[in-house]
Amino acid sequence: MSAKMKSKSILMLHMALLAALCGVLYFAYLGSTPFFDKGEPREALAVQDIVQRGEWLVPLKKTTDIPSKPPLFHWSAAISSLITGQLSESAIRFPSAVYATLGVLFLYVLGRKLFGANVALLGGAILATTTIYQNQALSARVDMTLCFFVTVSLGLFYSLYRGFLTREIWYYVFFSLVGISVLAKGPLGIVLPALVVGAFVVLKKRWDLVSKFCLHPGVVVMLILGAGWYVIAVTRGGEGFFDRQIIEENLSRFAGGSGHSHPPYYYIPYLFALGLPWSLFLPFLLWDSFKKGFLSDDDSLFLKLWFLAMFVFFSVSMGKRPVYILPIYPALSLLMAIWFYQHGAAAGTRRVLYRLMAALAGAAGLMLIVVTLGALWSHDPGWFFSPVERLLKAKDRANLLVVKNALATFGWSFTVVALLSGLLWLSLARSLWVGRLRSAAWRLVLIAVAVAFITRAVVMPVIAEAKSYREFMSKVDQQVTAHSKLLLYGSFNSDPVIFYRGGPIETLDQPLEELASRIGSGDLFIIMPEQLFVEIQKQRRDLPPPLLKSAGTGPEGDARLVLVRGGEL
């Protein structure tokens, strides 16, 4: 076999392996949980508006509310829903999983060109298994869409800089992708690539790149794609749209005038927490990167600036949420892969630290082996909850019982996964003990797959069902036909209720005292928080019980809902 054919075969094999890894981590769990937080149903309502009303240009929430983000994700989710023929959680989450998978594959292609196939394969696997990346790949939010287009934009810029891409058309592709990035999450689509490229140009003193890119005709294409939709949307949405998407979501968010304000050091703990399991090695990576020399080579420098420029920008911005730093992880993943291939056995303090990590990994492995043996002996996968159960309060014991019952539904499959995980942790401990870092890295990838099964198939569904209104709304639909009048009353997050109902629901706005006299009988149906119903019961002792009561407590965990009858208002 010729070298060219062998290289192509390796390329196809590695791409297939990474695609399979993403399939196991992402696509297998798209429908494993209902919507239960604030973010997903909020975006789902815009998708619902596109599918039901055909409002592609400026989709609205509840047919009246202007969404907080541009519609690129919503367009993608609407197309997914139309193709599958269902407006479901899995269909709406599908674009995030696709963008995440494409991002992993693109990072592999870029890393392969810069550092070789083996480093690129590990870099792609690291990105795919990083906690924040996995979470957003399974979330019906706009952040993975932005991350993908920013990643590809920066990768194309560097490929043009290095001369990997020489045809003029690639400049237009680059500018087009930057323009499209704006439709993912606003001006950040331009700001983030510009920060990285600008920092790179300054440090390399390549002033010729300024005129080469800033004066290129592709800039016009970028502006048309990025600003064109905003211009049209402002003419449709008027001052309300401008205030919502430009002032509140961008300028005020950066300056700290729209909530989520935090100090500059806010992201430091999240950098480690969201980067697990790979952030365990982040201190070593950062130390070695600066010790070796920040400007050591162009390829590593570009990745370092990708990470640092974005991290500093998000830290300086007053408005902060953990998910904002998602776009730094593609660069960090490649840097981590390079580090694993450049470092092996260590001496002195570092050997002690590696062996301390090995001891912790070994302890985790032994614990899982004990869990497995106990399950085989007692025929109860959740036997290990029993000693803890006696120490908890009644409410916590009830929650623990739910998790225990969920484990029982998986039977032997959970036991097998626990056993394999235990063996992998022990194997990881051995690799760390002897300083075989590359071997340890691949064991971490396999451990991440096992952890994904436990969290996505067992733990998260239990958490989701405790908060979601899906089951409640399914019962509401059985009692309240499409021809009956359904109303909402009270202050609670109604986005998931409206989504699962399948369309807008009118909201009542009147004092509780006026409503109380009309509750209990009539042709109307009203959904309200349980605590408000209790307040009405205090005024009317003869009030019949609600028709339905939700098991889910809502995104904030404090809004159990009831369905009641009401008279004409």
Model-derived regions: residue spans:
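Membrane-integral, polyisoprenol-dependent glycosyltransferases
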Residues: 2-352, 370-373, 378, 498, ...
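Membrane-embedded architecture of ER/inner-membrane glycosylation machinery
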Residues: 2-4, 172, 176, 288-569
